[in-house]
Amino acid sequence: MSYEKVLQAGKTVVGTKQTVRALKEGKALEVIVAEDADPSIIDKVMEAAKEANVPVTKVDSMKKLGKACKIQVGAAAVAIIR
């Protein structure tokens, strides 16, 4: 379901740095994180999402999340933005 949401989203940013930036700038509507990503990386995204009061959805695979974003590598985090 969330993979489909990413595929259908008009605008997204991919990666933890860009996701955290979008959250801090108030641009993120929703965040999707991969459960198989390194927890120390995802914790930064989760904390920023909590501070910004943005919902977080977890998916099982970085590889599938990357594929949904149409990139050839895995993605730990993706933000759907305005």
From Swiss-Prot:
Signal sequence extent: none
The terms under GO molecular function for this entry are: RNA binding
Which keywords are on file for this protein?
A: RNA-binding
Concerning Pfam families, the annotation shows: Ribosomal_L7Ae
Protein family membership: Belongs to the eukaryotic ribosomal protein eL8 family.
Query: What NCBIfam families does this protein map onto?
Result: PRK13602.1
Could you tell me what this protein is called?
RNA-binding protein GWCH70_0105
- Origin species: Geobacillus sp. (strain WCH70)
